[in-house]
Amino acid sequence: MTGKKRSASSSRWLQEHFSDKYVQQAQKKGLRSRAWFKLDEIQQSDKIFKPGMTVVDLGAAPGGWSQYAVTQIGNSGRIIACDLLPMDPIVGVDFLQGDFRDELVLKALLERVGDSKVQVVMSDMAPNMCGTPAVDIPRAMYLVELALEMSRDVLAPGGSFVVKVFQGEGFDEYLREIRSLFTKVKVRKPDSSRARSREVYIVATGRKP
C-alpha cells in the first residue's frame, strides 16, 4: 500500500479494529487475537473443554483459540493445530503449517492425531473474503464441510464440534447435517463477534456413536 491512499473501506476497518474493546483487551492481556474471547464465551455457556482432553484446532493462526484451549485442558491435554499461515509456538500445541485442503497436509494431520479419537474438533477457518457474498459464502461453506468431515473421522462418541460459519446459502442444510450427527446443537453469536459480521458459531455436543 506504499505510495497509495488506503481505500475508505479499509480505513474504516482499521479504525473499527483498533477501537474495538476486545482488540484492546487482547493487547493488554498479551493474547494472540480477539478470537480468545469468542471461545471463552462459548466455554462459559457450553462447557466443551475439560482437563486432559485432546483437541484439533483448524484455522489456528495466530493462535487465539489454541491459547485459550490450553488453559482449559491443562498439562495432561493435547492440542493438534493446523493453518496455512505460520503460528508462533505455544506450549502444549503441536502445530502443522499447511493447507488443510491439500491431501498430504490432511494425511500428516491425521497421522499426528493417531489411532485414538479426540474429544473436541474446532474450526475458526475462513477464506480470503472479497466482499461479494455469492463468491465468499460458497468458499466458506466448502471449508466448514471439510471441518465437519474431519470431525467425522477423528471425533470420539460424545465429543464436541465448534465451527465458525457465515450465514447465507447452504447454512440451513449444513445445520441440519450437524443436527443429525450430534445430540445437542446450538448457534451462538458471541458478544465479541462484530455485530455486522455474518459469522456465527455452531456448537455441537454429544457426537452420536
Curated annotation (Swiss-Prot):
It is found in: Cytoplasm. Keywords: Cytoplasm, Methyltransferase, rRNA processing, S-adenosyl-L-methionine, Transferase. S-adenosyl-L-methionine binds at G63, W65, D83, D99, D124. The active site is at K164 (proton acceptor). PANTHER family: RIBOSOMAL RNA METHYLTRANSFERASE, RRNA METHYLTRANSFERASE 2, MITOCHONDRIAL. Specifically methylates the uridine in position 2552 of 23S rRNA at the 2'-O position of the ribose in the fully assembled 50S ribosomal subunit. NCBIfam families: PRK11188.1, rrmJ. This is Ribosomal RNA large subunit methyltransferase E. It comes from Klebsiella pneumoniae subsp. pneumoniae (strain ATCC 700721 / MGH 78578).
